[in-house]
Amino acid sequence: MQKIAFHLNSLQQGGAERVVSNLANRFAKEGYEVVIATEWYGTDEFALDQKVRRVHVGLTKEDENRSRISKMLRRIWYLRRFMKKEKPDVVVAFTRGVLYRALAAGIGTGIPVVISVRTDPVGHYDKKADKLRIPLLFPHAAGCVFQTEGAKAFFAPYLQENSRIILNPLNPKYVGVPEPAVRTKNVVQSGRLVDFKNQPMLIRAFLKVHEKHPDYTLKIYGPDSKDGTKEIL
């Protein structure tokens, strides 16, 4: 295998985006040809090694006035066109909607598509639309990556048997960081303010801890996803 393609919506800072940027940069340094296909360009994106190519496969300005179904089909077509032109040895897709798009685009191309489930399937892969798309598209996956046994167990046996559990990669720059001479009494959570990370539950739980340990402080770091979570907090 010499050429690896990653597909996700953008490289705007988030968990899946961080993993893709780290993997892409590392594979490039190892001598692989790496290309990342994204739907759009976000603000405050992760940096890529100069050896990593990025290709836009999202909608054009002319597509904005199309119907929802037409936009969905265009996204699949643009990605399929990218795959046939680039001819990667494998496509690795991250995040829920992207998985379906990549699998649909890859049908008949002969290019293996590996999908990566990054979130708790309960609440994210159990909606009516998922129950229709998963049986149609997931059998086409060349493999699946999960982060936990629980996530793996959610899916059908055929997918479990064709999967691996791989933890998030750790950037070497964070290894061996010296511990502070004096620890502060802070509980820190880092991540986007978004519904599935459930920061409201964290706050409710911390309030109970704070009753017994009033000298502790909770600090939450992360950008606003604009889904209403910030307002709830």
Task: Please annotate each region the language model reported.
Residues 150, 169:
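Carbohydrate-associated surface elements
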Residues 1-3, 173-187, 210-213:
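Nucleotide-sugar donor-binding and catalytic loop/hinge architecture
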Residues 69-77, 109-112, 119-140, 146-147, ...:
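Nucleotide-sugar donor phosphate/pyrophosphate-binding loop at the beta->alpha transition
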Residues 64-90, 100, 104, 128-132, ...:
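An amphipathic, basic-hydrophobic alpha-helix
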Residues 6-14, 18-20, 26-66, 154-156, ...:
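N-terminal strand-loop element at the rim of the active site
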